Amino acid sequence: VKLNPLLKGWSWTAGTFSWVEPTAYALVAVKQLKARLSQDQVIARVGEAERMIYDRMCVGGGWNYGNSTVLGENLWPYPDTTALALISLQDHRADPPNQLSLKALQKMLADNHSGLALAWSILCFDLYGNESSHWIDQMEKSYLETEFLGETKPIALALLAASHGEQIFRV
């Protein structure tokens, strides 16, 4: 495993391993509430969590659930996790790792048409000011084929993505 275990983000369960997804959710929330929180604590906590996410970035950009390398093998990034990580790092949109990961996300979507991946990606592209109409069309096509298997999370995120709901995630 190649990661810095000293960098802490957030975990699914208290006192356990820091994962990219819950860390990204927490970062968006904390960044949106930072005006109401102690600035010293927010700056330190956000900075460490951002460093943790960047530390876990896969070779070539993007993220998976928590590790970039295991047993000497580079792991693949996932589009949904990549989009969510980029959403949490949107205030660093011009930084090279973010730009590399945006390009990687575009490539990942060529082979992945899941509702969850498309919805998170559209929200991400919209937050970064990138064109998303092609992906909205792809999401609609995917929904017509699968109805996203009736899963609430991708359906809800797709509705947000199709209606410019990215503002909910703006930090």
Q: What kind of region is each of these model predictions?
A:
Residues 1-51, 56-100, 108-134, 146-171:
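An alpha-helical repeat/solenoid feature that recognizes helix-turn-helix modules
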Residues 141-145:
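Glycine- and acidic-rich phosphate- and metal-coordinating loops
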